Amino acid sequence: MSPRASSATAHELSRSGLLSSLPGETLAKLAQRMTREDVPAGAAVVREGEDGDRFYVVLSGVLATTQESLGPRGLLRPGDTFGEVALAMDVPRTASVRALTPAVVASCDRATFDEFVRPLFAED
């Protein structure tokens, strides 16, 4: 994966069901702190069992999730998120994610996740 200099945009993040409830100003602040990354087809973004230190939003492309014990688990498309389980529960990655097509993801570190995203789980 190669990080780009640009951050995600609030509009791109607003397509995520998880993040869509954030006010526009908050979404814009989160977008500024996220890093946009190009992911070539076939490349792994995260691997099951690794330490989870980033949260991801799919901006374009299709990615597949797999678990060693269960095999393929599903597809991720624009607006979908991953990485939140490892960060929210402080556990190793529970699945691997690999790009099926060229993809773009936006990601943030644990501190940004804790500030902007973790509170959304308390609302459920």
Annotate each PLM feature:
Residues M1-D124:
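Cytosolic regulatory regions built on CNB/CRP/Popeye-like sensor folds
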